[in-house]
């Protein structure tokens, strides 16, 4: 699905350098590290000793994340067109890799083919027949609050509908970051459900980030300087609420953002939604 993603630099609310739980310094201006694999369709860079960021070249830096524990690894999202993605990640980690999705849009599921099973939230099953029509493996479900034990590293699944009905965000609380897919937009948020649902998810993640001291979220279209911060999530919550309460008037858009005809644009983020689906 074509998306109009405006890769404006996000204003990060954290300090110029932030240490992870192991004390590794990470440059907040660009968390993408050294290149460990590159071909015509994807480039993988190392974030820390056990985490890698992949960027596809088809739809505005569509991003995938390889997250490794002592016993196994998960691959979060699969890009748009990445042939033999299983063989690519096998060059990066020797651990068995399980494919998991933040949501089922075409620019996040394109490389799932070689994986024998794929995990996602059941809320996105209505779009799977279109976006994953050729997938022959098993589809399994991830539930809100589910904890994935990778061996010495745990990843928690939190339900964040809004962009799609089944969007989820993955959190590594020990490292103080998460992987949010398109739930908060990569600076250009497309709400395919409604604003009430998006506001609910933003408020929930705002509280989660405060409670667990989450520094930032790696988005689904990461360009190196557009991390999602607590402030960004709070701004999205407030902008949705203001539209719903009549305090902020949306403007008409040209419909190029996923066919959506309304938008609000402020604080470095654009929220696109459809008047046909209703705001509530």
Q: Which residue stretches match the model-derived regions?
A:
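Metallo-beta-lactamase
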Residues: 73, 80-81, 156-159, 165-243
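Active-site HxH/HxHxD metal-binding segment of metal-dependent hydrolases
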Residues: 81-151, 242-245
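Short, basic/low-complexity N-terminal boundary segments at the transition from targeting/disordered tails
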Residues: 22-46, 123-130
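Conserved beta-strand hairpin/beta-sheet module of binuclear metal-dependent hydrolase folds
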Residues: 38-91, 169-182
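Ser/Thr-glycine-rich phosphate-binding loops at phosphate-binding pockets of nucleotides
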Residues: 100-103, 121, 160, 164, ...
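Accessory terminal helices/loops
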Residues: 15, 19-35, 203, 207-280
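Sec-dependent N-terminal signal peptides
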Residues: 4-14
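Short, hydrophobic/aromatic-rich segments at coil-to-beta transitions
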Residues: 47-53, 145, 154-156
């Amino acid at each position: 699905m074509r998306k109009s993603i405006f890769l404006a630099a996000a204003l990060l609310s954290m300090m110029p350098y932030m240490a992870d739980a192991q004390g590794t310094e990470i440059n907040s201006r660009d968390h993408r590290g050294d290149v460990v694999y590159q071909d015509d369709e994807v480039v993988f860079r190392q974030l820390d000793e056990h985490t890698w960021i992949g960027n596809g070249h088809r739809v505005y830096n569509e991003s995938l994340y390889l997250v490794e524990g002592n016993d196994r690894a998960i691959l979060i999202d699969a890009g748009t067109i990445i042939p033999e993605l299983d063989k690519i990640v096998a060059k990066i980690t020797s651990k068995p890799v399980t494919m998991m999705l933040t949501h089922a849009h075409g620019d996040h599921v394109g490389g799932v083919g070689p994986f024998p099973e794929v995990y996602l939230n059941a809320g996105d099953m209505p779009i799977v027949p279109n976006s994953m029509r050729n997938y022959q493996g098993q589809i399994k479900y991830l539930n809100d609050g589910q904890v994935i034990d990778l061996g010495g590293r745990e990843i928690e699944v939190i339900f964040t509908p809004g962009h799609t009905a089944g969007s989820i965000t993955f959190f590594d609380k020990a490292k103080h970051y998460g992987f949010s897919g398109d739930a908060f937009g990569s600076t250009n948020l497309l709400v395919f459900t409604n604003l009430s649902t998006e506001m609910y998810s933003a408020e929930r993640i705002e509280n989660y980030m405060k409670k667990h001291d989450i520094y930032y979220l790696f988005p689904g279209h990461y360009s190196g300087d557009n991390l999602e911060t607590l402030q960004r999530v709070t701004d999205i919550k407030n902008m949705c609420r203001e539209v719903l309460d009549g305090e902020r008037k949306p403007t008409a858009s040209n419909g190029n953002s996923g066919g959506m005809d309304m938008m609000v644009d402020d604080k470095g983020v654009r929220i696109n939604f459809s008047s046909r689906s209703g705001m509530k």
